[in-house]
Amino acid sequence: KKNVGKMQKPAPDDLNNLLVYLRTKMTNQVKYDRNKDRQGLFKEDFFKTSYSENLQLLQEWIEESKSDSTIPSDALPQQLYLTMLTEYTAGFPIEEIKKRMNQIVYYCKQCLDIHRQYGQKEDIMFIWGPEEWAGEEQPNIIGLCLLFERMDWLETIKDSLNPYNDDEMYYDPSFRALMNMAIPTKFDPSAKFAKGGHNFRKPLLQAIMAESKEESLKYLNTYLSGWYEGNRKIGNLLIDTHLNQDPEYGGYIGYWSFESAAVAYLKDLDDTSLRQYLYYPKDMIDWARA
């Protein structure tokens, strides 16, 4: 269920900087360079139209949060995530992706404050959706926190996954194991994955838990080889969206497994074999290692 509440007024400098950034992006004609496209799947017209509309929507919601208007409290982090993925896919510099992540975490904190003030335990707000329904958002957000080495961000994301620190709440063991690589996170590595095909993430968990680099690399290759079809099996609506890039209906933002890169980064793996996969974010791990 979506929890609705009043956004607390953001710090003026943070808000004004974001608004200036959005207005600049919208004022200047949106440009697309296929040579920078990290997957090479965007159609130019679709990208320009969808990205401009996303920026316009963000500006409207940011303006609403500046006032005391009531908006869905999880709307901004989700929309910022979609915009960030679009920007990464289109080839935006990593430093801009980092700024966007900072905005996502900022509004996650706002959401948590709203929920703790107005929410009820039986009406938990899921900014990223319950873990038994999780697509790629949760592991991607966790993975990006790790690749940017921002444990403060990760603490906020961890709180947003389980606002009440409820041990009885379902969790995906691979997500918790991923967070535990950097910050103490309670989880049971033998916990079952959700029904409906979510056990395609078992090799990710095995890669994290493996004692040797060779084993970790083997499991990551297995995970990535089944990543796309695994997401299809669980009903991830992003899958195959590149095939229908209609600005009115299409939803392609890119396909990425930042969690895989985070494991390779933290375990200092030779990721040469992982770079064959279109959705392995090699630019991101190269930036982290620089």
Can you say where each PLM-predicted feature lies in the sequence?
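Eukaryote-skewed repeat-based solenoidal scaffolds used as protein-protein interaction platforms
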Residues: 9-243, 252
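Alpha-helical oligomerization segments
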Residues: 214, 218, 224-290
